[in-house]
Amino acid sequence: MALLQIAEPGLSAAPHQHRLAVGIDLGTTNSLVATVRSGSAAVLPDETGRSLLPSVVRYGDQGVLAVGYDAQKEQNRDPHNTIVSVKRFMGRGVSDIKDAGSLPYRFVDAPGMVQLVTRAGVKSPVEVSSDILRALKERAEASLGGELTGAVITVPAYFDDAQRQATKDAARLAGLNVLRLLNEPTAAAIAYGLDNGSEGTYVVYDLGGGTLDVSILKLTRGVFEVLATSGDSALGGDDFDHRVFCWLLEQAGVTAPSAHDMRLLHTRAREAKEALTDHASTRVTAILSDGQSLDLELDQATLHAITKTLVDKTLTPVRKALRDAKIAPEDIQGVVMVGGATRMPHVQKAVADYFGRAPLTNLDPDKVVALGAAIQANVLAGNKQDDEWLLLDVLPLSLGIETMGGLTEKIIPRNSTIPVARAQDFTTFKDGQTAMSIHVLQGERELVSDCRSLAKFTLTGIPPMVAGAARIRITFQVDADGLLSVTAREQTSGVESSIEVKPSYGLSDDEISRMLSESLANVQEDIEARKLREAIVDAESLRDATLNALAQDGDLLDQAERAEVEAAVAAVASAIAEGVTRRVNEASAALNHATETFASRRMDRNIQRALKGHKITDL
């Protein structure tokens, strides 16, 4: 996602009136709401003093709804109707949920997004999330004693357009005015930067319940600049829980657990993982539905062993982000740890070993994102800040369109600071072409087949012209929430078509991995493939133009000359079929040479036609 915020935008017409605005961390495991009071950001607790709200919703009998701790207490007894970690389902289909088989839910693969069957009917992740947001809204309004002006809601940096739009829809359903969606690492940077006055280059390592986000941030005299982002939208604390869950099943010899057992053991797995944050070992006890009694000991060494591959996997986006920012680990001034999963000692040790320094943990990793969001919300609501500050965020993946030959033309490159608008002119490929299909793409590769398709739309009503004469301006705009709109406009006639890109499905793990790692692994191969495709497109254009010219003015050539041109055309076709860049370029050059005399004669004829019937004085 991306954000460009300068000083105090949208100042209130009543500058001395404090508007009630909050920051919301809509988390996978827990959610929080925070606000700015007397110049300081603080998390708003519930009536019993608890800051965290478990991101759990239960749909009970007779329409009774429970959110948070009340729902969490019932998750083992009523697993089908108690939805946990719904954030992982936002903007995704069933095929995108890698551990769907081990979850106790009844999924419906509806168009656009997976849905869940509950006692209260079929619920979408948007509806479930809205229930969590509504509970946070009610908590905030009760604590602040008034109606909220709006909220800044945080999302993982690697949430795509579908997931971001789903988050905004959930907020609107909950009755919240969304001031802005804010990347979670960026929110953490705001909290650390403004609270500590830090300067230098920092890494924000955000390992939450369901996602990993890594951001490289440069902080200089109140200016926050995001140099690069990377991450994994399906790697988080839940995956560590799942490894412990599988270990428990294996140790107990359970091969076909019931829904009750799955939920119970998932809960015990999470509790054991959290206990090992402060203890060397912990006991796991449970009574399964068949009466089997479970009593196992889990120590830190075992937890480390069964989750080592996950910890190692978290460092891959770290390396990618550093490479994108062109910064070495030793150039980092500090590492900010965000997210409850970063409490695990072996995660902290792995990060410390990689950077050669202990990470920063002076703010509560569970609260830091909400605190940063609250500071941002306070500014957007028009409340006065003592210090002006500037925040520059970036787009994590390049955006572009498909051009002839199946090539990707990047309009906005990755790591561009946004909000941003970029335009580029394109033209027609065929004579008399009156429509153009616009295929919007996301990714770093050169070929369309290796990028992610976001949307397609068609511009119609282009005036018939010779190939290359029309001018179609394609404009990409990415707003402050990272949502994309694309407009195509034919310059002479003014005909226009546009689309807002809201993909039906989120990125799968494989797609994310392919986009962010294969783009580097296949650089040379992609360059060569692009050269060949470009050569073929040029050759086909030259071939078609030559054949059209022969059809119109072939009488300008004698039999031998025509045979030479036709042989050159055939050579181009043969080279295209052969698929060797050098051969295609050579054949195109030979065809250009063979048609030089023909082109000169056609030009003379056209001049004679234009001058016929005119006097010199008319010219």
From Swiss-Prot:
Keywords attached to this entry: ATP-binding, Chaperone, Nucleotide-binding
Coiled-coil blocks: none
Keyword check for Transmembrane helix: no
Origin: domain of life: Bacteria
GO MF annotations in UniProt: ATP binding; ATP hydrolysis activity; ATP-dependent protein folding chaperone; unfolded protein binding
Entry annotated with the keyword Nucleotide-binding: yes
Stored Pfam families: HSP70 (PF00012)
GO biological process: iron-sulfur cluster assembly
PANTHER family, A to Z: HEAT SHOCK PROTEIN 70KDA
Function: Chaperone involved in the maturation of iron-sulfur cluster-containing proteins. Has a low intrinsic ATPase activity which is markedly stimulated by HscB.
HAMAP family: HscA (MF_00679)
Family under the similarity heading: Belongs to the heat shock protein 70 family.
NCBIfam families registered for this protein in UniProt: HscA, PRK05183.1
Protein name in the entry: Chaperone protein HscA homolog
Lineage: Bacteria, Pseudomonadati, Pseudomonadota, Betaproteobacteria, Neisseriales
